[in-house]
Amino acid sequence: MIRIKHIFEAHIIVRDLQRSVGFYRDVLGLQVGIEQPERPAAFFWVGGRGKSMLGIFTIGSWPTQMMQHHLSFQVKLEDLLAAPQRLRCAGISPKGRRTPSYPRGEPTDEPIVFAWMPAASIFFDDPDGNLLEYIAMLPDLPRPELGIVRWSEWNAGHTTRIAGSGTNTMTPVEQLFEDHISVRDLERSIGFYRDMLGMEVGVLQSRSPEGMGGALLWIGGRGRSMLGIYSLGSTWPLTIMQHHVAFEVTIEDLLTAPRNLRAAGVTALGGRREPIDEPVVFSWMPAASVFFDDPDGNFLEYIAMLDDQPQPELGLLLSWSEWQSGRKEGKAKSHK
């Protein structure tokens, strides 16, 4: 089994590319990695080059017609190089570059390299057709003029190395933390993500006899990053948001987020989209969060893991002051 470190990349759909580039760059402070007006699309580094990435695409632009959803998982380079063989042994087809004949990626025996990052990748499908990706950042200088090349081509002709990214980010966002996808069969998908990709089930949410409901899975261990999967027809959260992406921040920055968002003309929201003046706490994690909308209604979240034991018996969703009161009474640390 390939050991996934954390969610690396997520994609959302927007109406106006330039407006959204401005929002994610100027309001959230994300660093533009590359703009592709011919698609049209843009990719942002989250937390600095190589940490995690957000892609935004306009309605109707490629690749939104060719996939239900896309998730990227960061892995070690040595595991990535072994991924094609391991995927085939599990009955899954590894994929590389997209071509007119293979719009979801041509069959491959080796990774491909996105030279502008640079990073090596292998793509594959989950049981519902969500396009998944294993990705490993490369310790090389970006070479955007090369486009997308096979691993053997990159490895043969690229020798310049650097010790690190050298990026000084201006944003308090540390990394991409959470993404959600829709699935047809919840039990089947829990099995796939748990047994095939090695994720740990964090919590199951309101499953009905028909199998509707959802699950949240830890990636790379509790507190690293998280994937939410929801069956088609679930009433939550699919009806309250176009798409959801969570960004990990420090607790200090989270506590000032409602005020900072208001100063930028953005309304701070709770988990049920109600206006708030303080974070909310998901006690089963536990983590504190502040939600807000981007210009297209994508449901965004700042999140900070808390240094406490999970306390779901306090209620799954509390205000920050309620959680703090519980901690002062010794309830939030009763199992330490």
Question: Model segments located where?
Answer:
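Core segments of cupin and vicinal oxygen chelate
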Residues: 2, 11-54, 171, 182-224
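Short glycine-enriched loop/turn motifs at secondary-structure junctions
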Residues: 4-6, 64-68, 115-116, 173-175, ...
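Hydrophobic adenine-recognition pocket in adenosine-nucleotide-binding enzymes
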Residues: 10, 71, 179, 245
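Vicinal oxygen chelate
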Residues: 15-18, 72-131, 138-140, 151-164, ...
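Short, charged/polar surface micro-motifs in flexible loops or helix N-caps
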Residues: 49-51, 62-64, 76-80, 222-224, ...
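Short glycine-/small-residue motifs
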Residues: 53, 133-134, 226, 299-302
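A short, polar/charged loop-to-alpha-helix boundary motif
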Residues: 139-153, 307-322
